[in-house]
Amino acid sequence: MCLLIKKLYLTFARSTSIIITLVIIDQLSKWWFIDNLRWTPGLMLKVTSFLNMVYTWNYGISFGLMREYYQYSNAIFLITNTLIVCYLYYLMIRSNTIGSFAGYSFVIGGAVGNLIDRCFRGAVFDFIHFHYHNYSFPVFNLADCFITIGVIILIEDYDNTKKVIEEKIKGNYDNAQIEAMAEKIRNTDQGGNDKV
């Protein structure tokens, strides 16, 4: 029991420090660009031929979707995002691999960064804008980058874990061991977080 409490404490301490670090980086970047871009002509700073820093507020969800429903949806976004962050934190504490732990930390850090914006500013501040000729990618921020990186890590971790389980099954195991491993794969495929 004491070992379980120690593991939970270490997981909580590590995850919280990673999440807080990511939130601080996100909020400092937003603060700096809000403070400096508002005085830039056209609210835009050209960095390269394909990258601009722009001053824009996102009242919708990712990439500005549903922004026309802002007056009805901000409270719903706040509640939904908070519940999702809590659920992801629960999954992270249950995670058994470094990859899933890191992936959840990045997703939660990014989600909390955007949640802070929505809670205290009423919208999410976006400032990174990639474009090339007539193509223009939606404006985003570092929190969005953290979420994307976290999802990529989680997908890679899932694939690697599944490969390890499949390799173990190919070995010389008795039927009970094979059935136990297959059950873990089924649980993982159904959205569980069990890993071998």
UniProtKB/Swiss-Prot annotation:
It comes from the Bacteria. It is found in: Cell inner membrane. Pathway: Protein modification; lipoprotein biosynthesis (signal peptide cleavage). Keywords: Aspartyl protease, Cell inner membrane, Cell membrane, Hydrolase, Membrane, Protease, Transmembrane, Transmembrane helix. It is a multi-pass membrane protein. The keyword Transmembrane helix applies. GO terms for molecular function: aspartic-type endopeptidase activity. Pfam families: Peptidase_A8. Its main location: membrane. GO terms for cellular component: plasma membrane. Belongs to the peptidase A8 family. HAMAP family: LspA. NCBIfam families: lspA (TIGR00077). This protein specifically catalyzes the removal of signal peptides from prolipoproteins. This is Lipoprotein signal peptidase.
